[in-house]
C-alpha cells in the first residue's frame, strides 16, 4: 500500500481538537491521582498491600482469614493497603481498622461492582487502574495475595514481573490458600518452566503460606536477613516510582 493511500485510511485520520483536548485533560487527571497518592501515602510506612476478590462475602472462611491476617499485620506495625472495595478488600480494611496501624483504601471508579467499604482511615479515589497500581507498589514492604479473579491475577502478574525484571526492589510476595493457588503453580512449573518462558528460579519470587502467624513471621524474617539493600546498579534499574 502506497503512502498516499495509507494517509487517507479512516483508521489513520488526524485527531480533532476536541478529542485532543479530552486526552490532554486525562493526562492532568492522572497527574492529580499520582500527586494525591504520593502525598497521602508517603508517611504510611511500613505497609503491606493485600489483594483479593471483590466477590467473596462476609462469613466466607476466606473473608475471615483475610480479616485475621490484616489485623495481625496492623498490630505488628504495618499499615494495610487494599483496593478499598467489597469482598476480601473489605476484609483487609476491616481487620486493619480494628488494629493499631492505618487502614488504607485505593478505591477505583467502576461502572459496576465497586463501592467503597467503610473501614478506611485513608481513602484515595482513582479513575485509572495503572496509577492505582503504582500506589500499591511504591510504598509496600510486602504483598499478600488472597484468592481472586482477573483483577487479582493482573496485580499478581504485574508485581512478579516488576521484581523479575528488576524494575522494583525484591520484597516478599505471599500467596495465601494453597487449594486455590496450587493449580496455577502447577501450570507455572509444568508448562511455563517446561517451555522455557520462565526459569525455575522465577518460582522463588513468591511463597505460599496458609498460617496467619507464618505470614507475619515470614515478612519479619525476610527483612532480618536482608542485611544490605540493593546495589547501586540495581537501584539504577528500578523504575522511578
Question: Whereabouts are the PLM-identified features?
Answer:
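Glycine-rich beta-alpha loop segments
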Residues: 2-7, 13-106
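Generic secondary-structure signature for well-ordered alpha-helical cores
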Residues: 36-40, 78, 97-101, 111, ...
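Solvent-exposed alpha-helices and their adjacent loops that cap or buttress functional pockets
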Residues: 41-43, 72-74, 96-97, 114-118, ...
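Structural motif
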Residues: 46-49, 78-79, 101-105, 121-124, ...
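Acidic/glycine-enriched connector segments
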Residues: 87-145
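Short gly/pro/ser/thr-enriched loop/turn and capping motifs at secondary-structure boundaries
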Residues: 109-115, 152, 180-183
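Active-site/ligand-binding-proximal alpha/beta "capping" segment
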Residues: 127-179, 223-228
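C-terminal functional extensions of proteins
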Residues: 175-241
Amino acid at each position: 500500500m502506497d503512502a498516499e493511500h495509507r494517509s487517507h485510511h479512516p483508521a489513520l485520520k488526524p485527531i480533532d481538537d476536541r478529542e485532543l483536548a479530552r486526552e490532554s485533560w486525562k493526562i492532568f487527571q492522572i497527574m492529580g491521582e499520582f500527586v494525591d497518592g504520593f502525598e497521602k501515602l508517603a508517611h504510611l510506612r511500613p505497609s503491606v498491600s493485600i489483594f483479593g476478590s471483590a466477590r467473596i462475602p462476609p462469613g466466607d472462611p476466606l473473608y475471615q482469614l483475610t480479616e485475621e491476617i490484616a489485623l495481625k499485620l496492623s498490630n505488628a506495625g504495618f499499615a494495610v493497603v487494599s483496593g478499598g472495595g467489597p469482598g476480601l478488600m473489605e476484609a483487609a480494611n476491616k481487620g486493619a481498622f480494628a488494629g493499631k496501624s492505618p487502614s488504607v483504601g485505593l478505591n477505583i471508579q467502576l461502572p459496576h461492582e465497586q463501592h467503597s467499604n467503610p473501614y478506611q482511615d485513608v481513602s484515595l479515589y482513582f479513575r485509572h487502574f495503572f496509577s492505582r497500581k503504582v500506589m500499591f507498589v511504591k510504598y509496600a514492604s510486602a504483598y499478600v495475595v488472597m484468592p481472586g479473579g482477573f483483577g487479582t491475577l493482573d496485580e499478581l502478574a504485574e508485581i512478579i514481573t516488576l521484581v523479575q525484571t528488576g524494575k522494583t526492589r525484591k520484597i516478599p510476595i505471599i500467596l495465601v490458600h494453597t487449594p486455590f493457588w496450587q493449580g496455577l503453580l502447577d501450570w507455572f512449573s509444568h508448562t511455563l518452566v517446561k517451555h522455557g518462558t520462565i526459569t525455575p528460579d522465577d518460582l522463588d519470587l513468591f511463597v505460599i503460606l496458609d498460617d496467619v502467624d507464618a505470614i507475619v513471621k515470614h515478612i519479619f524474617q525476610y527483612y532480618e536477613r536482608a542485611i544490605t539493600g540493593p546495589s547501586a546498579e540495581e537501584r539504577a534499574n528500578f523504575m522511578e516510582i
